[in-house]
Amino acid sequence: GEAELGAPVRVYARYSCDQRYGSTLTVRRLRAAQPEEFDPDQLAEGPPIPYEQMLGDLDNLIGTVQNPYLRELLERLLAAGTETGDRWRAAPAAKVYHQAYRHGLLEHSLSVAQGVSAMAATFPGIDRDVAVTGALLHDIGKIEAYQQTGGAIDLSDAGKLQGEIPLGYYRVRRQMEAIEGFPSDLCQAVGHIILSHHGKLEHGSPVTPCTREAALVHFIDNLGGTLGSFDRIEKGLADGERWSSFDRALSGSAYFGARSPQIAA
């Protein structure tokens, strides 16, 4: 039968291995897979960390935010049972390159915020509450920018027309304005983190990081995305392979040799 977007397919192909480009499948025939031909659980990629554990870690991290305005902002936006919170917990973090699966945005945002929290204790002069809040919310626009059809992830109309940074900024800004007495300096600080987290104008940010907190979130976010690409690449390697083929996200190949048994496991 005719295959639908995001639905499993059965592929008949010829395998070959090119010295330069690596493993290749030349597709001969493709059709929609029948329900008895696949296990949905095997096709549903997800985070390596159990979902319930991530939710517990999220609650614990929000609980460490001392500023009452910032904690209320996080609780309003990310609480379970709210429209924004439920979408944020379920959304993917990307279309292809890293955490491109259900709950991927939660996984990515939480890991960035945890990294920011740890680094804030190392470097002086950083407002930890602002940095952690900005880290948890920096990609919140992706709940509108991406849409999922079955297993397929693509940009929504809003994502194409406006972009995830403006979508996220205005969602957070509206919530800050709805909190009575929310300080204008905190509004500026958190908003700046969201607007600048891509780091450069040519990478899609309307401004570059101008505060310690924004710079920290940008660099940890970039690190998280890069390491997420390594995870994605490694999953696609055959047993025993150490080198990947060229990967666009890394602008090169990835190497997975000389690893300790504990890490390899």
Go through the PLM ranges and name each one.
Residues 37-161:
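Acidic/His-rich, divalent-metal-binding segments that scaffold phosphate/diphosphate chemistry
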Residues 98, 107, 118-236:
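Divalent metal-dependent catalytic cores for phosphoryl transfer on phosphate-bearing substrates
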Residues 6, 112, 221:
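Divalent metal-coordination and catalytic microenvironments
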Residues 51, 55, 70-71, 81-85, ...:
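Alpha-helix initiation and N-capping motif
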Residues 218, 235-236, 240-265:
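N-terminal intrinsically disordered, cationic/polar leader segments
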Residues 12-46:
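OB-fold/S1-family single-stranded nucleic acid-binding modules
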Residues 12-17, 24, 47, 102, ...:
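Metal-centered catalytic cores of metalloenzymes
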Residues 1-12:
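Short nucleic-acid-contacting surface segments enriched for D/E, G, S/T with interspersed K/R
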